[in-house]
Amino acid sequence: MAGRSVRVPRRGSAGTQSRGQLAAGRDLLAREQEYKRLNEELEAKTADLVRQAEEVIREQQEVRARPFSALTTSCKEEGGSSSRDLLSSEGTHPWTETKPKTKNTGPVNKIQNRLHSADKERKTNSSAKLKYPDAQTANDVAIPDDFSDFSLAKTISRIEGQLDEDGLPECAEDDSFCGVSKDIGTEAQIRFLKAKLHVMQEELDSVVCECSKKEDKIQDLKSKVKNLEEDCVRQQRTVTSQQSQIEKYKNLFEEANKKCDELQQQLSSVERELESKRRLQKQAASSQSATEVRLNRALEEAEKYKVELSKLRQTNKDITNEDHQKIEVLKSENKKLERQKGELMIGFKKQLKLIDILKRQKMHIEAAKMLSFSEEEFMKALEWGSS
């Protein structure tokens, strides 16, 4: 019974530990999928921003390729009053090299607003990504095929080369650059796009570094989980072996009890036989006192009875000696059984102590995990407040 009471809580603790490990593994996988999705969105936003910059250059090249009459009509339609003021201030030669007196900064502001909105979305994704400390990144991120060879330095050099070769038109058809002079539009575009791309490159490098750190942490946690699973398997094996030993000792104890019962039955039968023989002796003594008349005739029979009585006494002595020996043997066996019983009780106590120690170790491990998580969240909250 004691072995069964020990075995049941041990299985429960192993089951709860395995369920906790499975739940932790599922949580890690869900976080990994979430971070992959956020990283894909970030890469898509970056690629979209680069495509927008390339579209601006392409539209400028298309506008430059148009004839002069189409350019003037498009500037008049899109520029409105600002283009008319620019033409009136320059007189009859609106397309000369002289700079206008009033500078139109509307298209530059449009580009800045567009890039600023994209940057806001990207920062929102990166902040949502930093909220979770345990994630797999860097090596497991799915990157689009057209973005594998992306380099901000190459993109900047390509844009600068196109601007140096083609230049900006005096009046472009695009809404973002219409009404801006050639020198101001080129400088503003190059300076703004260059700064924006450098900032994005730095943010991307910081995100990749953070992803690698998180991946190292996840690998450490996986190794810890693996070690815990191996410890659990070893503990289960030891428990099963101890349970088999307990069952074996139980069987031996039952067999010893059966043997003890059999010996007790034999002892009771011998005692009954001895009592019957004693009664016979009493009857013989009474018959001797009653048969004084027949004493002479019964002398021979008395002698015979004496011989038989001596034999019976001898046999009784032998039987009593054997009974004493059997009793001593039974006592020694009972002592052995009591000793085995004491050893079993000591083993049960040791197992209970081992179970308590394992429960405490489990509680310490869980407390250490909770403490580490709380410290990391506190440090991240401090960093977030300072930023």
Swiss-Prot record:
Entry GO terms, CC: centriolar satellite; cytoplasm
Domain of life: Eukaryota
Annotated tissue distribution: Testis-specific.
UniProt subcellular location: Cytoplasm, Cytoskeleton, Microtubule organizing center, Centrosome, Centriolar satellite
Region (Disordered): 1-25, 58-133
Coiled coil, from the record: 184-347
Disulphide bridges, residue numbers: none
Major subcellular site: cytoplasm
Keywords noted in UniProt: Coiled coil, Cytoplasm, Cytoskeleton
Bias type Polar residues, positions: 70-91, 103-115
Descriptive protein name: Testis-expressed protein 9
Organism of provenance: Mus musculus
Record gene name: Tex9
